[in-house]
Amino acid sequence: MVLMIILDNSIQTKSKAYSISKLITINTLGPEGTSSEYAAKNFITNFTLLQGVNSKLSLHDTFESCIEKTLQSPLEYTIVPHAYDGIKHFYMRPDLQLLQIFRCDTPMYGLAVRPGFEYTDDMLDKAVIVSHPSPINLIKYFTRKDVTFDLVNSTSAAAKRVKEGLSDIALTNELARQKYGLHFVKTFKSIPMSWSLFGKGEIHDEN
């Protein structure tokens, strides 16, 4: 795991009126087992706790839901990976502000199946792989296969579908694999990733 602060506007100095004794909330994509949860927990451990800021983690179905929570209170923040295509919209919003950028590499990614499922490589030519949209190019780069995907909201949701028998193969991470009792038939890599921390912005009427 690598966690490095690239840009620091500081949660504490965002508004001098805030007391570090107040509880802040870090919102990100859930459910448990996502790479976003992993990054948020590492951010809390390596930044907010060291800065003396009390914080809790809140997981949501979409990053847009996280942002809606952030817009409701100056004590609500959202962590989003730069691999998420929709992050470009968050940078444009006048009611949000970018507070920090940091690096936190993801857990290992790979193809996971249920225990007892008999996997063979030729399945990639015809099987449908359940995955979050962001990491799907791992299949292309590591297997040279043009596969079909069933897209879901998170890597954890992908693993859950395999556990429940709704899909046979998931592209997921190590945390979700463990959580849902799956095993990897292929491992790819821990993805080097940077993340943005957003807070509620202050809109100034210039008219």
What residue ranges belong to the model's regions?
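Domain-level signature for soluble enzymes in the chorismate/prephenate branch of the shikimate pathway
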Residues: 2-207
